From Swiss-Prot:
S-S bonds: none
Protein name, entry field: Elongation factor G
Keywords associated with the record: Cytoplasm, Elongation factor, GTP-binding, Nucleotide-binding, Protein biosynthesis
InterPro entries: EF-G-like_DII, EFG_II, EFG_III, EFG_III/V, EFG_IV, EFG_V, EFG_V-like, G_TR_CS
Length: 693
């Protein structure tokens, strides 16, 4: 099958936003106008095309990012609809990793909200160009220019309107195009009849003012345009569009559009902007990776002529076809039935069938080309973040960063029959979602699941019940603490056992130092002269890793520690891997006496919105919960408080806030970082864990 759309005419985009900004409805309208669906499904009626899991339709939020492909103006647009709820941040992160551009959807009444900040920060990390769609212009309190100001104030984004609304709330009836300087007036409810008119007289001054600001902002990103602008020459519409495209692709400028997806206004113009301003796979730098045979860096330009290279970014269990692996092709061509190499695992995989996805329906295709996003059936060993490549041209692409889970709970099957099924169900769910961890407590035999938040674990337990028919009892949520060392120290681990026959002998000296936050555990072998033979070095590292899984204070996993093995001794006959593993774990225990071990707790960035009269209550809540206020701002009659609060103190806060504000207050929280717990709290945690032992 020949390539249908050239790379220049391909767009891979994500739709990202805060929960309830109208993201799924926006995607629905895109599918409607591009001819993919014939009837529009409303999210609040549970009928949306993109929200296809049962829980999504019940809860009216998007949980898994469904991928779909559509056509607009002779271009192919591959769309990934990402969740806006903070507990599903990995879904956003992994889709951003494989996208070329994104549409950030705002609620025009609220502007930038907490989760908008999170996804914006992630998109900036991955260098993803964005356009902004200020949605819900028909909503009471909608304020387009306020929304634009929040992009500047909260995100420090160089964002400028390329459109202005005509009217707002019930009176929202059209859009001013600041490039063409024309008005688009909507005359029916489906948004299909649009009249292009002159800008209404009462909006002309404002339009000219914002057109001038737009031209100046774009000129500042381009030397040639700046010269023309300073010399007073007119910048043509074509030059302005080209300037916006270049600056947007370079992530120096963010065009802002407006509309109401629910009322079918502005979506086609937003689709035009996707084509006009977001990059094709040819506009972004070639993907980099490491050749596993040479350890050299290599690149793969977007071209069908290059060797095949793709990244698996999502695993899903489909009720009809089984395990689906979603992947983005960066270079080359792949045909169904062929073999590829999973370079991350060193395993050969056969591609059974290739499917092009449309929310929850699928079309079988026999070939995918560079720049495409598709799903494969039949891959057994591939997980999220793995590279799939041509067997003769190996490359390992940069993987996907997986955040650490912050909350855990115990699950136990209700019956013996459920026990076996639960193991299989949890394994499959963990394959799909790398932020979901399943562990067995060695001492109690209990199964502990960890994730990014209460809703995250709720949904997974719910899926276990519905999809795998497993009934389970669920314990109360617990915080996922971590442990670390705060001081450097040197420690000896010496293990010797003589009891007739072959003995055991292992002797190591290890220097422990605190590592940078987020760097995890790093091991260095600094042995000189073979005082510890080379074959025992991996056993020392393994002994440390195993011991650090159950830390030195309260049994929580240890993070961010460097260990340097610099001395030791061995016995010709009695030394073994086991002896050196035990010696390493003894060195860690010894180090704990002088390395100032500390317990770390997850700190959440909490954003609380309350009526002005409840501000005092909220400040009291934050202080009482060991939190610290980071900032406040007024928005209408409400106050927005941003604070860092330990997760351990936030359980049950929804009820407290509801009663303090008579149900008018709301809050959002997102994991931010780990921090040392105060000494008094640390002692409590240790006592509690010792008591349980």
């Amino acid at each position: 099958m020949a390539r249908e759309f050239s790379l220049e005419k391909t767009r891979n985009i994500g739709i990202m936003a805060h929960v309830d900004a109208g993201k799924t409805t926006t995607t629905e309208r895109i599918l409607y106008y591009t001819g993919k669906i014939h009837k529009i499904g409303e999210t609040h009626e549970g009928a949306s095309q993109m929200d296809w899991m049962e829980q999504e339709q019940e809860r009216g939020i998007t949980i898994t990012s469904a991928a779909t492909t559509a056509q607009w103006n002779n271009h192919r647009v591959n769309i990934i609809d990402t969740p806006g709820h903070v507990d599903f941040t990995i879904e956003v992160q992994r889709s951003l990793r494989v996208l070329d551009g994104a549409v950030t959807v705002l609620d025009s009444q609220s502007g930038v909200e907490p989760q908008t900040e999170t996804v914006w920060r992630q998109a900036t990390e991955y260098g993803v160009p964005r356009i902004v769609f200020a949605n819900k212009m028909d909503k009471i309190g909608a304020d387009f220019l306020y929304s634009v100001s929040t992009l500047h104030d909260r995100l420090q984004a160089n964002a400028h309107p390329i459109q202005l609304p005509i009217g707002s709330e019930d009176d929202f009836r059209g859009i001013i195009d600041l490039i063409k300087m024309k008005a688009e007036i909507y005359t029916n409810d489906l948004g299909t009849d649009i009249l292009e008119e002159d800008i209404p007289a009462e909006y002309l001054d404002q339009a000219q003012e914002y057109r001038e600001k737009l031209v100046e902002a774009v000129a500042e990103t381009d030397e040639d345009l700046m010269m023309k602008y300073l010399e007073g020459e007119e910048i043509t519409n074509e030059e302005l569009k080209a300037g916006i495209r270049k600056a947007t692709i370079n992530v120096e400028f963010f065009p802002v559009l407006c509309g109401s997806a629910f009322k079918n206004k502005g979506v086609q113009l937003m689709l035009d902007a996707v084509i006009d301003y977001l990059p094709s796979p040819l506009d972004i730098p070639a993907i980099k990776g490491i050749n596993p045979d040479t350890d050299e860096e290599e690149t793969r330009p977007a071209s069908d002529e290059e060797p095949f290279a793709a990244l698996a970014f999502k695993i899903m269990t489909d009720p009809f076809v089984g395990r689906l692996t979603f992947f983005r092709v960066y270079s080359g061509v792949l045909q169904s039935g062929s073999y590829v190499l999973n370079t991350s695992k060193g395993k050969r995989e056969r591609i059974g069938r290739i499917l092009q996805m449309h929310a929850n329906s699928r079309q079988e295709i026999d070939t995918v080309y560079s720049g495409d996003i598709a799903a494969a059936v039949g891959l057994k060993d591939t997980t999220t973040g793995d590279s799939l490549t041509d067997e003769k041209a190996k490359i390992i692409l940069e993987s996907i960063n997986v955040p650490e889970p912050v909350i855990q709970l115990m699950v136990e099957p209700k019956s013996k029959a459920d026990q076996d099924k639960m193991g299989i169900a949890l394994q499959k769910l963990a394959e799909e979602d790398p932020t979901f961890r399943v562990e067995t407590n060695v001492e109690t035999g209990e199964t502990v699941i960890s994730g990014m938040g209460e809703l995250h674990l709720d949904v997974l337990v719910d899926r276990m019940r519905r999809e795998f028919k497993v009934e389970a009892n669920v314990g109360a949520p617990q915080v996922s603490y971590r442990e670390t060392f705060r001081a450097s120290t040197q420690a000896r681990g010496f293990f010797k056992r003589q009891s007739g026959g072959k003995g055991q002998f292992g002797d190591v000296w290890i220097e422990f130092t605190p590592n940078e936050e987020g760097k995890g555990f790093e091991f260095e072998n600094a042995i000189v002269g073979g005082v510890v033979p080379r074959e025992f070095i991996p056993a020392v590292e393994k002994g440390l890793v195993e011991s650090m899984a159950n830390g030195v204070l309260a049994g929580y996993p240890m993070v961010d520690v460097k260990a340097k093995l610099y001395d030791g001794s061995y016995h010709d006959v009695d030394s073994s891997e086991t002896a050196f593993k035990i010696a390493a774990s003894l060195a860690l225990k010894e180090a704990a006496k002088s390395a100032q071990p500390a317990i770390l707790e997850p700190m959440m960035l909490v954003t609380i919105t309350v009526p002005e009269e409840n501000l005092g209550d909220v400040m009291g809540h934050v202080t009482a919960r060991r939190g610290r206020v980071d900032g406040m701002e007024a928005h209408g009659n409400s106050q927005i408080v941003r604070a860092y609060v330990p997760l351990a103190e936030m359980f049950g806060y929804a009820t407290v806030l509801r009663s303090a504000s008579q149900g008018r207050g709301t809050f959002m929280m997102v994991f931010d970082h780990y921090e040392d717990v105060p000494k008094s709290v640390q002692e409590e945690i240790i006592k509690k864990n010792k008591g349980e032992d």
